[in-house]
């Protein structure tokens, strides 16, 4: 199979109005900004799967194999503009306390040398690009052994990120940083049939959570759910998860299932939130690797 996908995100004019407490307990305008953002991503992929059934008397194992390749490119560009005004401006009195900023403040009559003016907050550090190459192959075998059924296999993955970031704020100064990993992810699934309606399952598998482009880049973007700015961390490492699962399953009738499961997950280098304080009070969230974590339950 062969696939192609394209995704984009275009924010042509996002306006952010920030207010703060001023005299007489009224909320006054603190800052007005406009942001123009464009993200484009292209993904090309190809994959192939193979299956071979064998028969050795009553023993009927199955061999499975496959390969997968993916190439992804991304570009992200953003520009931010701020409205400014001088302390001795000739704007209408009390404009900072206007309820409808768009209608009462951002009007043609309020633009001028001694009124409102618009300037760009140049920051090339917020732009980035990159590409990702992933090559994978897997091999697995299914072994029916009477009441037991064993499926075991492994997946090999080669993954390479190339992130292109600017090193200077006021000019285009792209620098490429490469991140590469070669990993093997084993898995095994053991099923034991107690009878026609009940069975036990035990499984183990290893997986990975790789950092995304925006989690690695130095780009700063505003997250409305957090109510704060977010910045990436180019020192992030992939997080690896070892998954264990033990399950009892009962099928009392067709279409019905009752199961009880215990799971345990061990995380190495999990990616977590962190934050720093900028400008005395503003929070900037980012990402970091914790040393490890465990998660288990029933």
Summary of predicted features, one role per range:
Residues 2-10, 82, 104, 267-270:
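Short, solvent-exposed beta-strand-terminating loops
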Residues 10-15, 51, 191, 247, ...:
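Intrinsic disorder/low-complexity detector
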Residues 2-32, 162-179, 216-231, 274-286:
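Solvent-exposed loop segments that connect transmembrane elements
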Residues 233, 237, 257-298:
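Outer membrane beta-barrel strand-and-loop segments of large Gram-negative receptors
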Residues 1-2, 57, 139, 273-275:
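Polar low-complexity intrinsically disordered regions
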Residues 37-47, 53-267:
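Structural signature of Gram-negative outer-membrane beta-barrels, strongest in the C-terminal barrel
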């Amino acid at each position: 199979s062969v696939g192609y996908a394209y995704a984009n995100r275009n924010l042509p004019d996002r306006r952010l109005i920030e207010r703060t407490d001023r005299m007489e307990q009224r909320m006054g305008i603190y800052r007005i900004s406009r942001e123009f953002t464009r993200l484009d991503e292209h993904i090309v992929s190809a994959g192939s799967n193979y299956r071979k059934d064998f028969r050795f008397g009553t023993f009927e194992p199955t061999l499975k194999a496959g390969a997968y390749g993916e190439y992804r490119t991304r570009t992200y560009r953003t520009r931010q503009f701020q409205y400014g005004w001088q302390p001795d401006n000739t704007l209408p009195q009390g404009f900072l306390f206007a309820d409808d900023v768009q209608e009462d403040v951002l009007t043609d009559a309020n633009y001028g040398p001694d009124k409102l003016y618009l300037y760009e907050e140049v920051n090339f550090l917020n732009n980035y690009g990159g590409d990702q190459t992933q090559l994978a192959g897997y091999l697995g075998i299914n072994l029916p052994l009477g009441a037991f059924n064993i499926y075991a296999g492994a997946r090999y993955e080669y993954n390479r990120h190339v992130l292109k970031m600017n090193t200077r704020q006021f000019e285009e100064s792209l620098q490429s940083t490469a991140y590469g990993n070669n990993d093997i992810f084993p898995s095994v699934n053991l099923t034991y049939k107690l009878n026609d309606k009940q069975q036990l399952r035990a499984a183990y598998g290893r997986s990975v959570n790789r950092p995304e482009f925006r989690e690695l880049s130095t780009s700063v973007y505003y997250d409305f759910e957090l109510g704060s700015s977010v910045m990436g961390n180019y020192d992030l490492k992939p997080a690896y998860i070892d998954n264990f699962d033990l399950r009892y399953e009962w099928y009392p009738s067709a279409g019905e299932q009752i199961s009880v499961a215990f799971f345990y997950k061990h995380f190495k280098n999990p990616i977590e939130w962190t934050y720093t304080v900028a400008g005395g009070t503003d929070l900037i969230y980012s990402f970091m690797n914790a040393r490890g974590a465990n998660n288990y339950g029933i």
